[in-house]
């Protein structure tokens, strides 16, 4: 069974280097023009590689240091690196799409204890020693809780932990008010209830 144009395009989406795209087209004649079929950039681009993807309409920015192009047919940007909720609010009207929005300690102090539904992660120390916090609802959009996120939230008596969360930070529930109740959830790692990293290797 031979791969067709659509199949090879799907496969090449997972290439990590521009040379892989070039070698594909040079090595297999019938796949020449593969890069021209892309309407988004599957990898970060520089001044040279940008010319090989002439039909991009949606530009993906994978790392903060990536070169950004604004010419041609590009009308939308998709940002993959972590962006604070504050920055997201500042720039969301610019036809951008943010894949990893972090609710930081600064955001929490500015916008309050209610976690916005756009948020994908809770930053390090986000609710650190927030002793006034009694209940918290974590949206299902959240997939990560940072280190010491709810550290010593002594008044916290109710928290929902959605199954969407796949990454828990060290000490994120250390000495919070409902620590014993959270410990009953066996899917949550023990290091979430330790204060320091070195406690793991004692």
Predicted regions and their residues:
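N-terminal export/assembly leaders
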Residues: 18, 33-38, 53
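Long, charge-patterned amphipathic interaction tracts in eukaryotic proteins
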Residues: 46-53, 64
